[in-house]
Amino acid sequence: MVNQSLKNKKIIISAGASGIGLATAKVCLSRGAYVYLCDIDNKSLNKLNKHPLINKRLFKYNCDASDESQVLDLFKKINKKTKKIDALINNVGVAGPTGSLEKLNSKDWERTIQVDVNSHFYFTKKAIPLIKKSRNGS
Protein backbone atom coordinates (compact mmCIF):
# COMPACT_ATOMS: atom_id res chain seq x y z
CA MET A 1 0.00 0.00 0.00
CA VAL A 2 1.29 3.45 -0.92
CA ASN A 3 1.65 6.00 1.86
CA GLN A 4 -0.71 8.75 0.74
CA SER A 5 0.60 11.48 3.06
CA LEU A 6 1.42 13.66 0.06
CA LYS A 7 -1.57 12.68 -2.03
CA ASN A 8 -2.31 15.39 -4.60
CA LYS A 9 0.20 17.79 -3.03
CA LYS A 10 2.07 19.89 -5.59
CA ILE A 11 5.81 20.14 -4.99
CA ILE A 12 8.56 21.98 -6.87
CA ILE A 13 12.07 20.50 -6.63
CA SER A 14 15.09 22.34 -8.00
CA ALA A 15 18.07 20.27 -9.20
CA GLY A 16 15.88 17.19 -9.17
CA ALA A 17 17.18 15.06 -12.04
CA SER A 18 19.81 13.21 -9.99
CA GLY A 19 21.18 12.68 -6.50
CA ILE A 20 19.26 14.00 -3.50
CA GLY A 21 16.78 15.86 -5.69
CA LEU A 22 15.85 12.72 -7.62
CA ALA A 23 15.61 10.66 -4.43
CA THR A 24 13.30 13.31 -2.98
CA ALA A 25 11.19 13.34 -6.14
CA LYS A 26 10.83 9.55 -6.01
CA VAL A 27 9.60 9.66 -2.42
CA CYS A 28 7.14 12.45 -3.21
CA LEU A 29 5.82 10.59 -6.27
CA SER A 30 5.51 7.32 -4.34
CA ARG A 31 3.37 9.15 -1.78
CA GLY A 32 0.99 10.56 -4.36
CA ALA A 33 2.38 14.04 -4.97
CA TYR A 34 2.58 15.96 -8.21
CA VAL A 35 6.22 16.92 -8.74
CA TYR A 36 7.44 19.86 -10.79
CA LEU A 37 11.10 19.06 -11.21
CA CYS A 38 13.73 21.24 -12.82
CA ASP A 39 17.38 20.74 -13.57
CA ILE A 40 20.10 22.33 -15.67
CA ASP A 41 21.16 18.88 -16.94
CA ASN A 42 18.87 18.07 -19.85
CA LYS A 43 20.51 14.67 -20.38
CA SER A 44 19.62 13.58 -16.84
CA LEU A 45 16.09 14.93 -17.28
CA ASN A 46 15.65 12.83 -20.42
CA LYS A 47 16.87 9.68 -18.63
CA LEU A 48 13.90 10.03 -16.28
CA ASN A 49 11.55 9.02 -19.10
CA LYS A 50 12.68 5.42 -18.58
CA HIS A 51 12.37 5.35 -14.79
CA PRO A 52 9.52 3.17 -13.43
CA LEU A 53 8.39 5.71 -10.83
CA ILE A 54 8.06 8.43 -13.42
CA ASN A 55 4.43 8.86 -14.28
CA LYS A 56 1.77 11.40 -15.13
CA ARG A 57 2.42 13.19 -11.86
CA LEU A 58 5.92 14.34 -12.86
CA PHE A 59 6.52 17.48 -14.89
CA LYS A 60 10.13 18.05 -15.98
CA TYR A 61 11.70 21.35 -16.94
CA ASN A 62 15.16 22.35 -18.08
CA CYS A 63 16.23 25.42 -16.10
CA ASP A 64 19.42 27.06 -14.91
CA ALA A 65 18.38 27.96 -11.37
CA SER A 66 21.07 30.63 -11.16
CA ASP A 67 19.54 32.54 -14.09
CA GLU A 68 16.67 34.68 -12.83
CA SER A 69 15.04 34.95 -16.27
CA GLN A 70 15.01 31.15 -16.65
CA VAL A 71 13.44 30.79 -13.20
CA LEU A 72 10.79 33.34 -14.18
CA ASP A 73 10.05 31.35 -17.37
CA LEU A 74 9.91 28.13 -15.34
CA PHE A 75 7.31 29.54 -12.98
CA LYS A 76 5.24 30.80 -15.90
CA LYS A 77 5.18 27.23 -17.24
CA ILE A 78 4.33 25.78 -13.83
CA ASN A 79 1.60 28.37 -13.35
CA LYS A 80 -0.03 27.13 -16.57
CA LYS A 81 -0.19 23.61 -15.07
CA THR A 82 -1.30 24.57 -11.58
CA LYS A 83 -2.41 27.71 -9.81
CA LYS A 84 -0.96 26.72 -6.43
CA ILE A 85 1.82 24.65 -4.92
CA ASP A 86 2.15 23.09 -1.51
CA ALA A 87 5.93 22.97 -1.14
CA LEU A 88 9.19 24.18 -2.60
CA ILE A 89 12.34 22.12 -2.14
CA ASN A 90 15.34 24.32 -2.92
CA ASN A 91 17.81 21.54 -3.63
CA VAL A 92 20.16 23.23 -6.08
CA GLY A 93 23.75 23.78 -5.03
CA VAL A 94 27.37 23.44 -6.06
CA ALA A 95 30.53 22.81 -4.10
CA GLY A 96 32.36 26.08 -4.02
CA PRO A 97 36.01 26.67 -4.73
CA THR A 98 38.46 25.42 -2.14
CA GLY A 99 41.94 26.41 -1.14
CA SER A 100 43.60 29.61 -0.11
CA LEU A 101 41.53 32.77 -0.31
CA GLU A 102 44.53 34.47 -1.89
CA LYS A 103 44.38 32.03 -4.80
CA LEU A 104 40.60 32.04 -5.13
CA ASN A 105 39.29 32.86 -8.59
CA SER A 106 36.61 35.58 -8.39
CA LYS A 107 34.63 34.05 -11.25
CA ASP A 108 34.37 30.70 -9.41
CA TRP A 109 33.33 32.49 -6.22
CA GLU A 110 30.64 34.48 -8.03
CA ARG A 111 29.28 31.31 -9.67
CA THR A 112 29.04 29.63 -6.26
CA ILE A 113 27.11 32.57 -4.80
CA GLN A 114 24.86 32.70 -7.86
CA VAL A 115 23.95 29.01 -7.54
CA ASP A 116 24.03 28.50 -3.77
CA VAL A 117 22.43 31.78 -2.68
CA ASN A 118 20.77 33.69 -5.49
CA SER A 119 18.97 30.70 -7.01
CA HIS A 120 17.26 30.02 -3.68
CA PHE A 121 16.14 33.65 -3.55
CA TYR A 122 14.76 33.47 -7.12
CA PHE A 123 12.85 30.25 -6.48
CA THR A 124 11.48 31.28 -3.10
CA LYS A 125 10.37 34.69 -4.35
CA LYS A 126 8.47 33.15 -7.27
CA ALA A 127 7.04 30.29 -5.18
CA ILE A 128 5.58 32.41 -2.36
CA PRO A 129 2.47 33.58 -4.28
CA LEU A 130 1.70 30.00 -5.37
CA ILE A 131 2.27 28.64 -1.86
CA LYS A 132 -0.01 31.29 -0.35
CA LYS A 133 -2.79 30.07 -2.63
CA SER A 134 -2.54 26.59 -1.12
CA ARG A 135 -3.17 28.07 2.35
CA ASN A 136 -1.04 25.40 4.01
CA GLY A 137 2.14 25.19 1.98
CA SER A 138 5.76 25.29 3.05
Regions flagged by a language model, labelled:
Residues 124-125:
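A short, exposed helix-loop element centered on a Lys and neighboring polar residues
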Residues 43, 61-73, 106:
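The beta1-alpha1 cofactor-binding region of Rossmann-like NAD(H)/NADP(H)-dependent oxidoreductases
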